[in-house]
Amino acid sequence: ALPICCVIRPFNADDIEPFMAYRNDAEWMQYQGFKGLTKEAYAEALLGNASLTQGMQLAAIDTATGTLIGDLYLKQENDIIWLGYTVSPRYAGQGYALETAMAVIDWCKQQGFLAVKAGVVADNLPSINLLNKLGFSCSCTEDDEQIFVLNIQSAH
């Protein structure tokens, strides 16, 4: 098991500026949709009353420093959870995306969800490699995204 280096929690107002710093980095965010917004727009999206069925963004915080290292997007679709993840470029390649994704998968299992899905642009190789490492398999392509699925409940 990985050491627990971060905690996943709802966003608070202090997270908005560090969130903007990487979300508005056009090169780093080339594969992402939620980017390039104003502080007010991010605050409205991140600090509102989000729900799993509407989709919610959560902060990934380094437990040692309290620093925002990235974020997760979760959306419930019946008994499936859609997962999105972003790590700040300052923290990329250190296993944070793997750790947070594993934590979400464990939580989804405990909640009784049947599968986790993620959509990835075909040339986003780091993300595809992460999903493969987690045991996801590519099920289909929709628009310009490959849809990866991980079935998390073993059949009885």
PLM feature segments, named:
Residues 49-54:
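Short loop/turn motifs at secondary-structure junctions and domain boundaries
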Residues 1-27, 57-156:
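Acyl-donor (CoA/ACP) binding surface of acyl/acetyltransferases
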Residues 27-47:
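Conserved GNAT-fold acetyl-CoA-binding loop/helix
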